[in-house]
């Protein structure tokens, strides 16, 4: 990895690798979806969805940095994963009958570029509907990465235009407003 930048003003993360591959990602300001875009890919990239391990019985490190903090202690069943050639859906049962679903779908709009959207939806027992994150992702893909990025940026621009700060000491206030990227 060569560089990672989080643009606070636009809530966009960019990652640049030594190979020239560039990734942009954001969680939309007003839509319940997130986006990722990889550019300058020299080979096919297939996104991988790795769910939290809420259960025992798998190989490898469990990620427990603090004794007793492992998610395995929750004992939830493994997530059900459904893969297609351009999407993956995970359904996870949790405490009290909670069910959440993560859906990720992607496309290759041009050679060397991969764009994808994702969403998470949940339901509790008695909810009239099943969680359907795919119902959020499909229209997002229909709108496209660039269109959603523009509405996302517009929302953040309007938010910053309505924002202000006033500090009793004018020197830190000036430093706040003169920060790069603001």
Regions found by a protein language model. Name each.
Residues 1-182:
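Acidic/polar, glycine-enriched structural segments that form the non-catalytic walls/loops
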């Amino acid at each position: 990895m060569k560089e990672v930048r989080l643009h606070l003003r636009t809530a966009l993360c960019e990652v640049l690798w030594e190979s020239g591959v560039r990734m942009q990602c954001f969680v939309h300001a007003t839509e319940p979806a997130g986006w990722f875009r990889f550019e300058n890919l020299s080979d096919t990239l297939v996104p991988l969805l790795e769910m939290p391990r809420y259960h025992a019985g798998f190989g490898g490190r469990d990620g427990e940095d603090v004794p007793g903090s492992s998610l395995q202690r929750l004992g939830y069943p493994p997530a059900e994963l459904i893969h297609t050639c351009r999407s993956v859906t995970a359904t996870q049962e949790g405490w009290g009958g909670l069910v959440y679903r993560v859906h990720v779908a992607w496309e290759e709009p041009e050679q060397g570029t991969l764009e994808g959207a994702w969403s998470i939806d949940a339901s509790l027992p008695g909810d009239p509907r099943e969680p359907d994150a795919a119902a959020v992702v499909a229209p997002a893909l229909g709108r496209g990465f660039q269109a959603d990025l523009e509405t996302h940026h517009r929302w953040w621009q309007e938010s910053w235009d309505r924002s202000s700060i006033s500090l009793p000491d004018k020197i830190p206030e000036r430093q706040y407003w003169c920060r790069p990227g603001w």
